[in-house]
């Protein structure tokens, strides 16, 4: 598919939408992001990114996408997205570039590679928004590199799983310049609710704390199910009973029914969760923190990888506990 290239004036002649606003705060209230004045780039069209990007296209934004496996972007292309052959090419055609990829090494490559990275193609005043769960130190590094080029960078990882992405109900943890985060709200609001957490890297710190909480919550959920099963309870009725009490949680809402149906399709991959928990543990070591629940959850999720189950969803933690106890949890409806 041919690229739809636009001709831009030299940055020395005219600055971008964001740079104009950073220099003239009086225009902030009137110069709001709209589909007519802001071009979007999107890098990473997996389980989460595909739905998130789709909301922007549906809202009328011109979007250029890049994904290493182009077939994973086909749905977006069918919706009207342009396709580029590199992150650099995406940035050349965009005012705001979003990324949501797998690992910190992927983030570094797609954003900071001197030849093919998005930052190398971004014009003065452009904005990078990394929505990958990654290392806080890398977010700080990207922000410094962007600032050196008179650009902006926001770390904005998300929580809410595939259903949150599909329904535009994600929780977004944003770190970076607060004014820039506020300017991006017309875009963030299409994907969920943005929460400003502080300076660059603080969005990543918040997401890592979120993952620590999720790990313990998921472990409690599957342990409770195994105990209820062994005690002879109807696990479906058990889940219904606890969901409205003090044990109710987002994990039950999102994954309880899937677990009962033994539906382990990924809303969020075990492989990626292991990566997240590994980053958490590294940060804990750096901070001098001992979080035994986090360490235990990491070991159990690593056991799923060892059994070739890394491409299942995080609710597959049930399988690790079933093997440990030689049981198989079944709903009466199964």
Swiss-Prot record:
Coiled coil: none annotated. Signal peptide: none annotated. Its EC number is 1.1.1.31. One of its GO terms (cellular component) is mitochondrion. The active site is at 207. NAD(+) binds at residues 38-67, 133, 275. This is Probable 3-hydroxyisobutyrate dehydrogenase-like 1, mitochondrial. It comes from Arabidopsis thaliana.
């Amino acid at each position: 598919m041919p690229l739809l290239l636009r001709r831009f004036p030299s940055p020395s002649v005219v600055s971008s939408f964001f740079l104009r606003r950073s220099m003239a705060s009086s225009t902030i209230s009137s110069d709001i992001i709209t589909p007519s004045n802001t071009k979007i780039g999107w890098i990473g069209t997996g389980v989460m990114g595909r739905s998130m990007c789709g909301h922007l296209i549906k809202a009328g934004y011109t979007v250029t996408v890049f994904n290493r496996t182009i077939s994973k972007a086909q749905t977006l292309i069918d919706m009207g997205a342009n396709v580029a052959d590199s992150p650099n090419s995406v940035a050349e055609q965009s005012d705001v570039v979003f990324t949501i990829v797998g690992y910190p090494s992927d983030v570094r490559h797609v954003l900071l590679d001197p030849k093919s990275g998005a930052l190398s193609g971004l014009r003065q005043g452009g904005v990078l928004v990394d929505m990958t769960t990654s290392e806080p130190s890398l977010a700080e590094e990207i922000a410094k590199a962007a600032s050196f080029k008179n650009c902006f960078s926001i770390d904005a990882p998300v929580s809410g799983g595939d259903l949150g992405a599909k329904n535009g109900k994600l929780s977004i943890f944003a770190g970076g310049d607060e004014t820039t985060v506020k300017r991006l709200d017309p875009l963030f609001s299409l994907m969920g609710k943005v929460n400003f957490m502080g300076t660059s890297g603080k969005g990543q710190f918040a997401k890592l704390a979120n993952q620590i909480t999720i790990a313990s919550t998921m472990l409690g959920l599957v342990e409770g199910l195994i105990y209820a099963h062994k005690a002879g309870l109807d696990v479906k009725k058990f889940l219904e009973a606890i969901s409205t009490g003090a044990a109710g949680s987002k994990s039950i809402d999102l994954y309880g029914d899937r677990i009962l149906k033994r539906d382990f399709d990924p809303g969020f991959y075990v492989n990626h969760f292991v990566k997240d928990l590994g980053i958490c543990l590294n940060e804990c070591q750096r901070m001098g923190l001992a979080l035994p629940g986090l360490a235990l959850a990491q070991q159990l999720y690593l056991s799923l990888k060892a059994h070739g189950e890394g491409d299942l969803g995080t609710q597959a933690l049930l399988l690790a506990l079933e093997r440990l106890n030689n049981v198989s949890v079944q709903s009466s409806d199964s």
